[in-house]
């Protein structure tokens, strides 16, 4: 099945859609993703990137040529990129300059909202090209099961019981989101015996 087929009947003009893939192997992307700035990061582009499109569909590259669906965004206007108006710990890439970049208004829609972090596509061999036309067909690799009982909230809130940790480790397919997010950053995790307090 092609990704575009999932949005059949939604009256989308694919000629005016851009597909983007953020590769977590890039340090600045991993850093912004960890800090919750992925949407902010993708809003900063060169003047022409999203000028002639109505929608941007975002994916996260976590391994190989895959793309994990993040959301569909309507494209609004743009304003100048001014670094000092961004969070201090935001990490711009080398192409983001105040002379060449703008900040696009990207409004997240509810299209496929229930598929965030679950729908996985094959981006194809052209992974170096992070932005492609919406008419470029993408094969759906998998739709992961929805798991709500153990949801990942943020990196500074990873506090799991041994039973929960065991469930995640031995059910990787169901808890793929945990594997992706924890492997995206370097970290040391402390295991503590709740009875003795020993680490």
Predicted regions and their residues:
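GIY-YIG nuclease catalytic motif and its immediate N-terminal context
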Residues: 1-197
């Amino acid at each position: 099945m092609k990704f575009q087929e999932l949005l059949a009947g939604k009256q989308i003009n694919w000629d005016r859609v851009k597909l983007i893939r953020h590769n977590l192997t890039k340090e600045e992307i991993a850093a912004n993703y960890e800090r919750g700035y992925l949407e902010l990061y993708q809003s900063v582009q060169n003047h022409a990137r999203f000028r002639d499109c109505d929608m941007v569909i975002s994916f996260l590259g976590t391994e190989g040529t895959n793309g994990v669906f993040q959301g569909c965004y309507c494209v609004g206007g743009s304003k100048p990129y001014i670094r000092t108006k961004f969070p201090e710990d935001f990490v711009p890439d080398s192409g983001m300059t105040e002379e060449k970049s703008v900040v696009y208004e990207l409004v997240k829609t509810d299209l496929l909202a229930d598929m965030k972090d679950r729908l996985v596509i094959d981006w194809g061999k052209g992974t170096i090209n992070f932005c492609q036309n919406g008419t470029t067909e993408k094969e759906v690799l998998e739709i992961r099961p929805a798991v709500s009982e153990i949801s990942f909230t943020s990196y500074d809130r990873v506090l799991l019981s041994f039973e929960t940790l065991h469930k995640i480790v031995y059910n990787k397919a169901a808890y793929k989101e945990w594997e992706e997010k924890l492997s995206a950053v370097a970290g040391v995790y402390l295991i503590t015996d709740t009875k003795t307090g020993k680490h």
